[in-house]
C-alpha cells in the first residue's frame, strides 16, 4: 500500500514559523558548548517541491482511534535548511571556560587580555539530504503520533559553511553535522512529530483551556515599577505617539483640559490637598485657630503655636496634637504607643564613689606636688601615709670602689640604691652559706643569711598577719624595720682610716688591719 502526499500544502508561513520555533528550541535545549558564542538560529527553512516516498509494509493494529504499522520512507528532494550562529575563534577563551566548568579555576593561569572572546559569524547550509529508512508508527487519538526508526535513515547530506576555504574545518564540520543529524532522527524528530500531532489531534477541552489561560493572563494589564524600566530598551512607536498626543493636549489655554487617569494635575492640586487630612487641617477644624487658617504648602505647624507665653494655651495645643497623633496611630495598630516622659523638679540621686583600691603616695617633695596640682588637677585621690619608711632592694657594690653614703638626711639612707656586701656573723661555720637558706649539710643554721627585704609599706606590714608555721626563708619585715630605725639614730660620723686616709662606711664595712710595720 502506498500514498500520494500533496507536498505543496506544507508551504505555509504559519507552519514554517512553527517548525522554525520548534527546531530552535530543540537545538538550544541542551548545554551550549564553549566553542559556540551565541545560540543557534534558523535563518532559512524551505521544504522544497519534491515529496518523499512513503510505503506501508505492515499494519499491526487498525481501529477508529488507534493505528500501528511499519513503513518505509525514501527521500532525495530539494529540502534545505540554513543555520546561523557565532563561534569562538580564541582557543584560550575556550580553555578558560572549560577550566571554570570543571572546577579547576585555581590551577588555570590568568591570561588577561589574551583570553578575551573573539567571535566569528558562521552560516551552515544543509542540503541534498538522502534518507532511506524503516520506521514504526503508533497513532492514538488521545496520545498523538509516535515515530521510531529501526535503522539509521541518513544516507548522505551536503554541508556548506562560511569556512569551506579551510579544508580542515570543512571536513570537521561535515563529520559533526552528520553526527548531529543522526541524533536528530533518533531523538529530536520523534519528539517534534509527537508535539505536532498533539497540537492538531487533541480533542480534550481541558487541554484547550490550559492553552487558553496563559493567553488570557497575558492580556491583563501588569503593574510596572520604576525598577522594571530599562532606559536602554527603545520605546515602541505606539507608546511614543500616545505620549506625544498627551503632551500636545496640554499645550493649550482652554479651561476644559482632558483629565489623565490615576494622576493629579498641578492645576487641581489645591482641591486635592483640601480633602487630604493633615495635622494643620485637624488643628484648624478642632481648635478654630486663626494662625493655621491660611493655606499651608506643607504639613508643618507654625512655631508660634508652641512658643507663646501663655502656658495654658500651649498645653492645650500640645494635648490636641497628641490626641490627633494617637487617633491616627490607633487606626493601624492596637498596641499602646511609647511616649517620652520628662519629669521636672526631681532630685538627682547622689552616689558616693568609694575607691576600689587605695593608692600609696610616693615620697614627692611638697613644693613639686603643689606645683603639679596647680597645673593639672587629677581626679585620683592618693592615700596619705604618715610613715615614710619602706625598703628597697639594694644593689651590692664592692667595698673598695664605693662612695661614702650621705647620711645628712636619714631618709636618703633608706632609699639609697647601693649597699655593701653583707658580712657573715662572727659565729658562722660551714653551715652558713651565701644563698637563701643554703646549708651544706642540710641543717638549719641559727642565723641565716637573708637577702635584702622586699619593698613593702608600713600599712601593709600592720595589716598582713602571718599565720601558721613559718618557713626557713621567712623574713620578719617589722623587726627589720625597727632595727633599721634604731640603727639610723645611732650611726656615728664617718671616719677615715688612719693609715690609708680612706673613708669608712660604718655598719657595713670593717676596717682593714694596719699595714705591717717592721
Swiss-Prot record:
The record's GO CC annotations read: ERMES complex
**Which keywords fit this entry according to its UniProt record?**
Lipid transport, Lipid-binding, Membrane, Mitochondrion, Mitochondrion outer membrane, Transmembrane, Transmembrane beta strand, Transport
Question: Its membrane topology, per UniProt?
Answer: Multi-pass membrane protein
GO biological processes: mitochondrial genome maintenance; mitochondrion-endoplasmic reticulum membrane tethering; phospholipid transport
Indicate, by first and last residue, each region the UniProt record lists as having compositional bias (Basic and acidic residues): 492-506
Q: Where is the SMP-LTD domain?
A: 1-198
Where does the record place the region Disordered? 335-369, 491-518
Q: What does this protein do?
A: Component of the ERMES/MDM complex, which serves as a molecular tether to connect the endoplasmic reticulum (ER) and mitochondria. Components of this complex are involved in the control of mitochondrial shape and protein biogenesis, and function in nonvesicular lipid trafficking between the ER and mitochondria. MDM34 is required for the interaction of the ER-resident membrane protein MMM1 and the outer mitochondrial membrane-resident beta-barrel protein MDM10.
Concerning its family, UniProt says: Belongs to the MDM34 family.
The UniProt entry, under HAMAP family, shows: Mdm34 (MF_03105)
Q: Please describe the quaternary structure of this protein.
A: Component of the ER-mitochondria encounter structure (ERMES) or MDM complex, composed of MMM1, MDM10, MDM12 and MDM34.
What protein name applies here?
A: Mitochondrial distribution and morphology protein 34
